[in-house]
Amino acid sequence: MTATRIFYEGRFVTLKEKIKTLGRFCTVGVGNTLIDFGVFFLLTACHVSYLPAQICSYTAGIVNSYVWNRNWTFCVKRKADGKEIVRFLMINIAASGITFLLLYLFQNCGCSLLVSKLAATIGGMMMNFIGNRIWVFGDSLKNIQDQE
């Protein structure tokens, strides 16, 4: 029996394939978040102010994100080009701006550092998923071969 295929983003895909890609994106996201939180709280424990700590921790997370999402989540086979890297950086700069703003706002509203960081992370992850899925790696999704 063959799997039901749907036409999505210019090609036919199985629901299993879509769930697998989303699962991989989420797995990479968890890894990015652990790196982000680990670096952030390590730096703040060393008395680095929370805003510079955010810049450093977020940067560590985006480097991890690019490598894993490109090679594992979206299975990009073509050589990385400047356009893709610039798009990735633009999305991450925008997401970083959102996390920075949310962290600042929640901290200045009296929320705990953990609640502030969680809220900022959720906002940044939403921006990141949408941008990477549609704009950065979107063309690659049309070329993924069934891995069944």
Curated annotation (Swiss-Prot):
The chain crosses the membrane at residues 25-45, 85-105, 118-138. Coiled coil: none annotated. Keywords: Cell membrane, Membrane, Transmembrane, Transmembrane helix. This is Uncharacterized membrane protein YngA. Belongs to the GtrA family. It is a multi-pass membrane protein. One of its GO terms (cellular component) is plasma membrane. The keyword Transmembrane helix applies.
